[in-house]
Amino acid sequence: MLKKTKIAIAGIGTVGSGVIELFKKNSIQKNFDIEITAIASRRKLKKTDLGSNSINFFNDAEKLIGFNNYDILVELIGGDEGISKKIVFDALKKGKNVV
């Protein structure tokens, strides 16, 4: 049996919202053992928007640096400097996969 793959998502714009919708509809989770463990977004979201009460929500992406309960970081903030660069490099230093 495969271990559960834990995902952290940084940035909930158009693409990030679409990823969340896919998870809420369970279209991905039916075929893969995947769990979203964290979301970082400046956008105000309600727990019901996330599809699960067990997802850690950060309104500051920099707080993902102190969070370790994920295997893959999905970085959707964009840009090659600033916070997006910082969280990607932090994840790579921790041995995490980054998309």
Predicted regions and their residues:
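Nucleotide donor/acceptor-binding cores
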Residues: 3-5
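Hydrophobic Val/Ile/Leu positions in short beta-strands of Rossmann-like dinucleotide-binding domains
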Residues: 7-9
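Glycine-rich Rossmann-fold phosphate-binding loop(s) that bind the pyrophosphate
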Residues: 12
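N-terminal Rossmann-fold NAD(P) dinucleotide-binding loop
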Residues: 16-17
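Catalytic-loop region of hydrolases
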Residues: 20-23
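NAD(P)-binding Rossmann-fold cofactor-contacting core
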Residues: 25-50
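A structured beta-alpha segment of the ubiquitous adenosine-cofactor-binding alpha/beta core
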Residues: 55-72, 77-80
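Beta-strand-loop-alpha-helix segment that lines the small-molecule cofactor/substrate pocket
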Residues: 86-99
